[in-house]
Amino acid sequence: MSYAKVLGATSRQDGYLEGNGYLVSWCVGHLVELAPPNIYDAKYVKWSIADLPILPQKWQYLVSASTKKQFGILQKLMHRPDVDSIVNSCDSGREGELIFRLVYQQAGCKKPFSRLWLSSMEENAIREGFAHLKPSTEYDALYNAALCRERADWMVGINASRLFSCLYGQPLAVGRVMTPVLAMTVVREAAIAAFVPEKFYTVALSFAGGGTASSKRFAQKADAELLLSKCRKEGRVTVQKMERKEKSESPPQLYDLTALQRDANRLLGFTAQQTLDYAQSLYEKRLITYPRTDSRFLTEDMAASLPGLVTDTGRAFAVEKPIPIHVQQVINGSKVTDHHALLPTKSMANADLAALPAGEWNVLRLISARLLCAVGEPHRYAETTLTTICAEEEFSAKGKVVLSDGWKAMERKMLGELLGKQKEPVVLPDVQKQSQCSVAGAELKEGQTSPPKHFTEDTLLHAMETASADSMPEGVERQGIGTPATRAATIEKLVQKGFLERKGTKKTKLLLPTDKGKALITVMPEEIQSPEMTADWETKLLRIERGEMEPSEFMTEINTMISSLVKTTEARKGANALMKNKILGVCPNCGANVVEREKGWFCENRECRFVLWKDNAFFKRLGKRLDAHVADKLLRDGRVRLKDCKSAKGKTYNATVLLSCEADGRSRFSLEFEGGC
């Protein structure tokens, strides 16, 4: 551990390290969690609309069953007589603050604690952080925001999931952030399905001196054909106007997490979660700064060290030409909150980058390229617009001449093959007003209007980030849905629960709602699926974090919304047909239908115990997954042939899995080997 190394705590014990007057231990995710409803009252074990809403007055917490041992170690360490103070060194963000405080409180600790707040895991940054520990009180508002977020998610999830599950007779997972994100994809698919393409026609004229000009669009083909005939007969165009404007494209901003995830999806095909995982690993290897940032700028005190970092980064990626460094382009302390923009670190200069896994190397490459581009010079070009007349109709053409590549040259150097083939700029002939040009060719072009595009991870992240922006007043900070740290997990959860699926043969997959996802949104009331309401809640959580809003005010609003939801929501007529589970086959035990649910394929007969679990231990031992295709084969044929099964010793073999039933109806699997092997 980096902290232990810097502090000199090098003696490894069970669950912690010790030395030089320090004890260094760790949390494993959320060690302490909100208690389930049945802890408040045993009646909540059974789901019933009559028991809703469930709105705890005094919140209760439990130690997570999977992390009890580590919690016990932390509790003992906190209460050791020789420990006089504690340092909260958890992740420098909202969730890290919550994780520590819940452990501290559940452990019954009263000793003073301070806060280590870092944006880099480099040894110098850690030493500096421990030398300037922050008072814990500076982060009380951050903790309050984290508590409100956790409790609001619990109340919406528990109450809405139970309400809609009871109304429609099957388990339905509803979430404060998850459901509005799903709704955005369903609305987009509905718009695509409802879209009626309209054909249009244009006439394109190519000039003898180079370049092509196009007419306006015609709805009727006959009108375009008439113009085409006239143009061919006339054979010349008269130049009405020639405009040349010099323009520039500023360098891109540094990455925050969402911008990095979007580019990694667009250029590399990575999911948001994959990018976050790669970035987290790079951070722990001290090669990049804190990844879960929402800022795209640096603070003023970083200006002096930035040129050295830029030079080191260029050298690490074999950039031989001198790098222009315009530091002030990336400095704006007023736009930095908890953490500055993502950067490579100076440690990268001495690291063996070739030894990195491919995914990590590519993410580091993106972050490094963005730094080198962000401090570069503008991309300058001249845009030419040519307007001509032929057969009394206006034709226009646009051309472009690059004056200075600027930052785009660095982008090509760093990311060349990822960017794909770039369009060659169109150079128009140099002509004078009222002069005439010969028409080398004229042709009819047919096109049609395009529907909205399906969401990819890139565009869905953008939609989450900018949700409600159009409906919020000017001057109000737009927070979007979720945070940079949680958006990836939201998408993954929707996929895992079967509401979204990734489809497509291209590197970057489409994110499409499943029939199950569409059905869920069909029955959801507006307040649960509204991106605007969820984005408004995120803004209020940010205000709590800044001490501008009382937590009690926010929680009262959530309570009121949930109470109203329970009181006013009724099952929609005809919706049960939409909500029916997909039938996969016939139960081999009792003959009833087997339907797919979140965790497996279940017999619809409540008296029957037959189920095929998706997370199946038998198939795991073979190194395989029990997916829909395998389940379908087992139900139809009672057997499925599997290739490349893995033995305990790592050897591979082919085998057939046979399905039968125990006396009580539960599924039983056995293996049949090929050739007696």
What label would you give each PLM region?
Residues 89-92, 169-171, 244-253, 262-268, ...:
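Conserved short loop/turn motifs at secondary-structure junctions
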